[in-house]
Amino acid sequence: MSKIIGIDLGTTNSAVAVLEGTESKIIANPEGNRTTPSVVSFKNGEIIVGDAAKRQAVTNPDTVISIKSKMGTSEKVSANGKDYTPQEISAMILQYLKGYAEDYLGEKVEKAVITVPAYFNDAQRQATKDAGKIAGLEVERIVNEPTAAALAYGMDKTDKDEKILVFDLGGGTFDVSILELGDGVFDVLATAGDNKLGGDDFDQKIIDYLVEEFKKENGIDLSQDKMALQRLKDAAEKAKKDLSGVTQTQISLPFITAGAAGPLHLEVSLTRAKFDDLTRDLVERTKVPVRRALSDAGLSLSEIDEVILVGGSTRIPAVVEAVKAETGKEPNKSVNPDEVVAMGAAIQGGVITGDVKDVVLLDVTPLSLGIETMGGVFTKLIERNTTIPTSKSQVFSTAADNQPAVDIHVLQGERPMAADNKTLGRFQLTDIPAAPRGIPQIEVTFDIDKNGIVSVKAKDLGTQKEQHIVIKSNDGLSEEEIERMMKDAEANAEADAKRKEEVDLKNEVDQAIFTTEKTIKETEGKGFDTERDAAQAALDELKAAQESGNADDMKAKLEALNEKAQALAVKIYEQAAAAQQAAQGAEGAQSSDSANNDDVVDGEFTEK
């Protein structure tokens, strides 16, 4: 069975891992980094992903960041003169990760396990699956990020029974999961979270502070200047990271804008104490899900054996202190918070292929599922933190006499009224025989698969007629749209490969020209003029082909030059070998003369 890669598709950074033997290994990107910025930019018709895209974010308005926060919505982003869905942008990131994983493995990759925040709803999970499909990946499993982290943490501890709390604060989302580990079983007891809380919010607090300080001093609102705002975003992210290691940092942004008197510069000193003060409310927000998860799991803090920190934002000192204060435990630092989720996803890939034995993952649904009933009430069929996959049925009836059809309004959430929860979909069961209200028996069944994706069916127990739907969010993509996007992604991949081939050829030509010119210059006046002249002629032809830009011509002329340069190199080698032989011969002769004189002794004599 081919390899299944593990992907952590993050808000700010993503990572890809693969199972090698029984070890999960992070695959470095082409720039040598173990995580890749989840950034996509468009320039001159080219799609740029990762570090290169992030570097040009300040100057390129066609740059998309933090697209994960829009997954599962109908919101589109405009770039490159076109509107893109969150699934399309996410697919570009996935395609890039897939590409360099293939380069590392030396084989095609078609299957992946992709992680999502535990608190992602059905629409967001479906959108993630669609993004994988557009990128040319068969998504074998959607795994919750804290669960994947626990899998990576606990793989070498399968003989140990312990309860762990995973505190996962990433770039855009926050999750807390409580798991019980023992005998290779990873059992999620409860999960809670906040999909609108992450490192981006901490950055925004710094940005708002800088905008306010600059406005006080100069009377100019930098939040209205798109380019200045991007520079502020970069500076805020850097300052946040700096303050994890030092207690004060200097934010310097020269020429941030221009005033009546000329260019203006931003210079602000930010202390860790001030940063903690600015972000106090965000840190406070992490405490509620921790308490809720413990309550849902029916555990007290004393029963938790380990606290695992996941996500780059858990490096913020105030966050670490809050975790210590809330749990009464020193967090376990045995895992890399940026890499552990992708590593866990790769392990789950190994479970699917059979390379990892005796590991069972029991995950849960993060939110309750149900339908709208009379009076706009939300009636739950599946409670949150129910182990998945699962199925649950309940019998309902009609609300009016001779009602010919029932509308099934499917919802996800925790609020008592339907209007306050997330609509997953609607469908209708028709042709119900005329009968007084309360008589028809309508059985509604919810199914949640291992990926947390929901399907619902309604069945009239009297006629056995049933209606069935797999929930597709109103904001989701149709099969036709996914198909079109897959074709676009494939076309982009071909175009990218062609561009890479052109760049490789250009580099090869430049290198050949440089090397040959150097050789011709160094061999001037040393003989073998025939070979030198032939190499020079081939060199001139290659330069002309380079000027024309014709790839086929360049390839042919490069081959010809390599042939002539090889002939010249052979002559140089032969001359060098002959010279060395001659030198060795001379040394041998000298040694021989010396040996012949070894027994000769000078003496004096006198005639008598």
Curated annotation (Swiss-Prot):
The lineage of its organism: Bacteria, Bacillati, Bacillota, Bacilli, Lactobacillales. Residues 576-608 are annotated as: Disordered. PROSITE patterns: HSP70_1, HSP70_2, HSP70_3. CDD domains: ASKHA_NBD_HSP70_DnaK-like. InterPro entries: ATPase_NBD, Chaperone_DnaK, Heat_shock_70_CS, HSP70_C_sf, HSP70_peptide-bd_sf, Hsp_70_fam. Induction: By stress conditions e.g. heat shock. Disulfide bonds: none annotated. Residues 599-608 have a biased composition (Acidic residues). Keywords: ATP-binding, Chaperone, Nucleotide-binding, Phosphoprotein, Stress response. This is Chaperone protein DnaK. The modification Phosphothreonine is found at residue 173. It holds the Pfam family HSP70.
